[in-house]
Amino acid sequence: MTSNYVNILRKPGAFKFSAAGLLARMPMSMVSISSLLAIQSEYHSYTLAGQVSAVTLIAFACTAPWLARRVDIYGQRFMIPFIMASCLAMVGEIVSITFHAHPVALLVCAAIAGGTSGSMGALVRARWSNLLETPDEIHTAFALEAAMDEVAFIVGPILATMLVTNPPLPVTSGLIVAVTAQAVGSLWFLSQRATEPPAKGRAAAQEQTGQSHVLRNGALVVTALTCLVLGGLFGANDVAIVASATEHGHKNLSGAILACFSTGSLVAALIHGSRQWHWPLQRQFVVGVTVLALGASTLIFAPNLWFVAVAAAITGMAIAPTFTTANQIVQHSVADNQITEGLTWLSTTINVGVSVGTFLAGLAIDNSGAHGGFLAVTVMSWLAVVIAWSGARTLRRTLGVRQIP
């Protein structure tokens, strides 16, 4: 099972940039729940917490594809000043919460932080695409990065919850750790020039101008729309679980329960990447989305937190394989000089979905409690199924034209 992973991590510089990428991606699992807990504690409003999260992720969605397009042209170090701006804005948000500033101050800082962060996951996967030669190796690498995402989502929520709910520490301590990880991890990753994909330069800019826009790629559109709704599922789920744990008198267990999703996903990611699958990518994708919806639909019937935790672990086993396949679909279907942009569109739509799901679930929970949040999770999960199955023919046609080796 481990030989495939050992082989790719032995590539020059591979282990180092993957580790740096993991540290740089830690904020994605910490900022949302840290912000939610801190704002709810200081402002007593799930709605405001949802608004801050939504603004962060919508700002990310507005700028990330543009930044990714520039990265494909000018190289990954193009991101350094933007990431530093993101870190400074996050510090501003921490200060605003600490001194109970007007909500507008939080929203402005959140917009800047999200709008300048870029997609670190896309940068890491672009390095793997540049470093590796065969589709089988890339499949293993993308599964590994999905597993690394889940490591972040196991450690991050638990760490954030422990920090924020520990009385001697400030309620912003989770955000403080997150911004530190972002700064250190990003600079470590971007300083590794040996594995950085070569900048395409002005010639690539002219070539991109003459190409069809990446969003005219049918496979990317179907995959991105499905990920948009799945992101809504994840955003709603995060808030619903925090609300459920709070209603049961165990708010401090929120991070541990959220980590159950990631634990199941991590196990599935490692298994999925250890072998080669003979099903067509489009079939793997639509089946994965369907299984994920079936599992997510059980949460609305949860009588207690034990049920939520077990259902989360089982449902989570569909997450990493589904998103590994989604990234493979994009990697196979877009042009080589559009890979970073294509992969970023997936993370962009996921984050937009998370923001919308968080906001809608926050409203539902303020009105109907945790049950309303889990109802939002169920609706979004089956909407994703409808989109994936409706686009299966487009996926098959687009991938067939590209002729996967």
Predicted feature residues:
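A late C-terminal transmembrane helix in Major Facilitator Superfamily
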Residues: 337-368
